[in-house]
UniProtKB/Swiss-Prot annotation:
Task performed by this protein: Catalyzes the NADPH-dependent reduction of 7-cyano-7-deazaguanine (preQ0) to 7-aminomethyl-7-deazaguanine (preQ1).
Pfam family, one: QueF
Region: Disordered, residue numbers: 1-20
Protein name as catalogued: NADPH-dependent 7-cyano-7-deazaguanine reductase
GO molecular function terms listed in the Swiss-Prot or TrEMBL record: preQ1 synthase activity
GO cellular component, one term: cytoplasm
Localization of this protein: Cytoplasm
GO biological process terms on file: queuosine biosynthetic process; tRNA modification
Location of the active site: C56 (thioimide intermediate), D63 (proton donor)
Organism listed in the record: Rhodopseudomonas palustris (strain ATCC BAA-98 / CGA009)
C-alpha cells in the first residue's frame, strides 16, 4: 500500500469535499485528477454510469445510455465526484450519441493522460434502434486484465 499520508481536508483546488454548482454544459465542467500512488503498476480502473442522459440535438427529447469507462492510469487518477458532475452536465446538452460518447472519452484522456482508455456507450433505443458506440485511445498495455464491459446487447421483448 502506498505511504501517502492522509490529509485532513481535500485540496481546495478539487471539487471533492466542496459544495459546488452543477455545471450547465460540458464545457463548463471541471474534471479533477489526483496523483496515482501506484503509477508504476499497470491496473484497470472502471467507472460505470448506467443512467447517463443527454438531449437529442434535433428533437430536444432525452436520450439515455449506460456508459462504461475503462482506463489504465498513468500519472493521474480521475476523481469520481468531478466525473459525476461532468457527466451530469450533458443532461441539457444536445448532441448525437456518437458525439457524446467520443467527446467524453477524449476529454477524460486529455485531462488524465492514461496509458490506455476505452469508453462504451450503450444507448437505449429511440425510434426502435439501439446505438452502441465504442472508442479507445490505442493499444492496451501488456499484462492488464480487462473484463467484459458486462452490458448485454439490447433485446427488447424478442
Amino acid at each position: 500500500m502506498s505511504k501517502t499520508p492522509r490529509k485532513s481536508a481535500p485540496s481546495p483546488s478539487l471539487q471533492l469535499g466542496q459544495a459546488v454548482e452543477w455545471p450547465d454544459r460540458p464545457e463548463a465542467a471541471k474534471l479533477d485528477r489526483v496523483p496515482n500512488p501506484q503509477k508504476d503498476t499497470n491496473f484497470l480502473a472502471r467507472f460505470t454510469a448506467p443512467e447517463f442522459t443527454s438531449l437529442c440535438p434535433v428533437t430536444g427529447q432525452p436520450d439515455f445510455a449506460h456508459l462504461v469507462i475503462d482506463y489504465v492510469p498513468g500519472p493521474w487518477l480521475l476523481e469520481s465526484k468531478s466525473l459525476k458532475l461532468y457527466l451530469a452536465s450533458f443532461r441539457n446538452h444536445g448532441a448525437f450519441h456518437e458525439d457524446c460518447t467520443v467527446a467524453i472519452g477524449k476529454r477524460i484522456a486529455t485531462e488524465i493522460k492514461p496509458k490506455w482508455l476505452r469508453i462504451g456507450g450503450y444507448w437505449y433505443p429511440r425510434g426502435g434502434i439501439p446505438i452502441d458506440v465504442f472508442w479507445q485511445t490505442g493499444k492496451l498495455p501488456k499484462d492488464v486484465w480487462v473484463p467484459d464491459q458486462g452490458v448485454q446487447p439490447y433485446r427488447g421483448r424478442g
